[in-house]
Amino acid sequence: MTTPTTAPSGCRSDLDSRYHRLCDLAEGWGIALETLAAVGAVATVACMFALVFLICKVQDSNKRKMLPAQFLFLLGVLGVFGLTFAFIIKLDGATGPTRFFLFGVLFAICFSCLLAHAFNLIKLVRGRKPLSWLVILSLAVGFSLVQDVIAIEYLVLTMNRTNVNVFSELPAPRRNEDFVMLLIYVLVLMVLTFFTSFLVFCGSFSGWKRHGFHICFTSFLSIAIWVAWIVLLLIPDIDRKWDDTILSTALVANGWVFLAFYILPEFRQLPRQRSPTDYPVEDAFCKPQLMKQSYGVENRAYSQEEITQGLEMGDTLYAPYSTHFQLQNHQKDFSIPRAQAPASPYNDYEGRKGDS
């Protein structure tokens, strides 16, 4: 006769043992992480509603084009917080495929959206025509679909179509190595996003560089989190019972990094008025162009004469309200004498008469 297992402190006696970490007071990390994940999920949903509300508040059309990709990004963040519960619950035939498939797919969605945003900012900061919202969204979805194909292929080959318990049956070192190898494409996306964001700082329209900083700093913190959990997961000296704790902590930490260092700063920029320093080249035709000031019709004959005589512009006097022809080298100027009437031949007529 088997004795029933006693429920840990804080859990009901009839609760399945797979869910004991959600309420076990002795293992407080499960309760702490599920609380942070739940709060993060609620905050993400609130951000999604706020994003829909801000659509009519965004005055800059170039910022409005990013809203569909940012909404997709929030869906990925919501999935990251939700996936945390799959790592708090013990590994079995249901949580195993969920972990291996969704971990890479959700992060691929997030980093693909950041990479598409960085590509659009590179054009804007250089004054070029920005990408349309459909192109930005297509880039984000296209980059993330690669990880979907990789994850599906791995699951089909590993489970042999029907064996869903294979992940719990694998040795822990082998399972961790496969898990990390499955995420190589996500690591490439993350590093590519980080280095691409540096190109946003090379441009004349400085108003867009703030958005590039949000992407750069978010990618940097994400890389630090990923390096930490990968190293901890692959160290053989650590007790394998902490694997789920390490992965669930990485999920919660990265989810809050996405919210705190990308979403919230971007939301602060959305309702702001359009600044002249943010104008791309497509608005250049609205700006007045400087024209060369001209004081008359140029005569190439006189211009050529000035060149042949070797006259300098410093010797030219400009007199306002005068004609185009100005006095040059005024020290050698001379006056033309007035015309005088010739003497009449009859002035000496009377004198000639007296002589005769």
Curated annotation (Swiss-Prot):
Residues 57-68, 123-131, 200-214, 266-356 are cytoplasmic. Residues 1-35, 90-101, 153-178, 236-244 are extracellular. Keywords: Cell membrane, G-protein coupled receptor, Glycoprotein, Membrane, Phosphoprotein, Receptor, Transducer, Transmembrane, Transmembrane helix, Tumor suppressor. It is a multi-pass membrane protein. Glycans are attached at N160. Residues 336-356 are annotated as: Disordered. GO terms for biological process: negative regulation of epidermal growth factor-activated receptor activity. Induction: By all-trans retinoic acid (ATRA). It comes from the Eukaryota. Disruption phenotype: Homozygous deficient mice developed more lung tumors during 1-2 years than heterozygous or wild-type mice. The chain crosses the membrane at residues 36-56, 69-89, 102-122, 132-152, 179-199, 215-235, 245-265. Phosphorylated in two conserved double-tyrosine motifs, Tyr 318/Tyr-321 and Tyr-346/Tyr-349 by EGFR. Tyr-318 and Tyr-321 are the preferred residues responsible for EGFR-mediated GPRC5A phosphorylation. Disulfide bonds: none annotated. GO terms for molecular function: G protein-coupled receptor activity. The modification Phosphoserine is found at S303, S344. Expressed predominantly in normal fetal and adult lung. Almost undetectable or expressed at very low levels in other tissues. Its main location: membrane. The modification Phosphotyrosine is found at Y318, Y321, Y346, Y349. It is found in: Cell membrane. Orphan receptor. Could be involved in modulating differentiation and maintaining homeostasis of epithelial cells. This retinoic acid-inducible GPCR provides evidence for a possible interaction between retinoid and G-protein signaling pathways. Functions as a negative modulator of EGFR signaling. Acts as a lung tumor suppressor. Belongs to the G-protein coupled receptor 3 family. Interacts (via its transmembrane domain) with EGFR. This is Retinoic acid-induced protein 3. It comes from Mus musculus.
